[in-house]
Every structure is written in C-alpha cells, then in structure tokens.
C-alpha cells in the first residue's frame, strides 16, 4: 500500500470500489467501507491490499476482520438486466450509490477507486487512481465486494451447471466462452456483452 498519508480516513470518509465490471455473467457489485486510522493500520498489518492481489484464502480471512474493525460497511449491486438496459458505467455507479446509501450515516467525503467520478453522488468525492492499492478504505471495499460477489456466483453455479461459474466467477475465460457457444446464454448473462461472441 502506497501514498496512504495523502488519503484521508475517519468516520466521515468512505472508500468505495466495484467488482465484476468486466464479467459476462451476473451482477456488478460494490462495497463502501468507513475506516479509522487505527483500524486501517491493523488491516494493513494483516495483509490488506487490492483484492486482485490476494489469494482467495487471504481474502476470506480478511472479511471478518474488516467487518469487526470498520466503522461501517455496506454492499450494493446492479443486475445483468440493468447492465444491459443502461450500460456498464451507469450500472456500476448505481451499485456504488446503493452501497453508499446503505451506510448508517452519509459520508462527508467519498473516495472512489479509478479516474471516473461517481456522477450519481452529489456530495464531496475524490477519485483515486489505483485506489485499491493506495487507500485502506478502498482496499477493504474491494475485498468485501469481491467476496460477496464470488459467494453469490458460487450459489448461482448450482442453478446454471455446465458453465464453470464456480471456477471463473463469470469472467470471459476460454471455457466460459465455449460453454456459451455450446449452450447459449442464461437469463443472468449480460446479453449486450455477448453480441460479438454469439452474433
């Protein structure tokens, strides 16, 4: 984790991040996390960083620690149907907004991972490029969102066997693409994402 000193923490600051933006299947998830400095230090010592850099075992171990140490956390999601209807950027913003609105108190500042502002949020915000590697609050949000989405996709894999969802979590792996060609999409696939693949 780098440049922590330049990014605020505290009871009035929420970090927000999304997961599943590039998937072919299922919803896009977001999480919002409020962390005080002492909790951030504990989490960083426990190995907190960008969820993409963590093993599944490490991420799973961090979830209860984040939940016990944070001031507040919340999840939001936008469905594949919403993604098809309004596009991935708007759907991602909706998921982030839903997470922020589920916090017990509206944050005075939102740290948004990436370089695109959250257009639906009307309070103060700051975009943070590579935020999940620079802000403990954003990193914690990335872990919670990733674990929650992966758990949902594992449950859905039982409803839709044959697509390997439990292995690739809905991302466009070669196996997933071949399953789509062989069997066609499910109702929970993002049909607008499949036009090039399936014609």
Swiss-Prot record:
EC numbers, comma separated: 3.1.26.4
Catalytic activity: Endonucleolytic cleavage to 5'-phosphomonoester
GO biological process: DNA replication, removal of RNA primer; mismatch repair
GO molecular function terms noted in the UniProt entry: manganese ion binding; RNA binding; RNA-DNA hybrid ribonuclease activity
Keywords for the protein's UniProt record, in alphabetical order: Cytoplasm, Endonuclease, Hydrolase, Manganese, Metal-binding, Nuclease
Pfam family, one: RNase_HII
Annotated positions binding a divalent metal cation: 17-18, 113
Co-factor remark: Manganese or magnesium. Binds 1 divalent metal ion per monomer in the absence of substrate. May bind a second metal ion after substrate binding.
Similarity remark: Belongs to the RNase HII family.
Protein name: Ribonuclease HII
UniProt source species: Synechococcus sp. (strain CC9605)
């Amino acid at each position: 984790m780098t440049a922590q000193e330049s990014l605020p923490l505290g009871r009035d600051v929420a970090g927000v991040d999304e997961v599943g933006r590039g998937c072919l299947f299922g919803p896009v998830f977001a999480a919002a996390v409020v962390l005080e400095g002492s909790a951030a230090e504990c989490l960083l010592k426990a190995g907190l960083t960008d969820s993409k850099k963590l093993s599944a075992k490490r991420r799973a171990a961090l979830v209860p620690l984040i939940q016990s140490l944070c001031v507040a956390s919340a999840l939001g999601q936008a469905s594949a149907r919403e993604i098809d209807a309004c596009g991935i950027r708007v759907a991602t913003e909706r998921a982030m907004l839903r997470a922020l609105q589920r916090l017990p108190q509206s944050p005075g500042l939102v740290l948004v991972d990436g370089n695109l502002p959250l257009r639906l949020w009307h309070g103060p915000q700051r975009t943070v490029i590579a935020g999940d590697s620079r802000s403990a609050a954003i990193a914690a949000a990335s872990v919670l969102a990733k674990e929650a989405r992966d758990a949902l996709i594992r449950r859905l894999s039982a409803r839709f066997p044959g697509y390997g969802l439990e292995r690739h979590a809905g991302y466009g792996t070669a196996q997933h693409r071949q399953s789509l060609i062989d069997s066609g999409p499910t109702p929970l696939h993002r049909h607008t994402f499949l036009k090039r693949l399936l014609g």
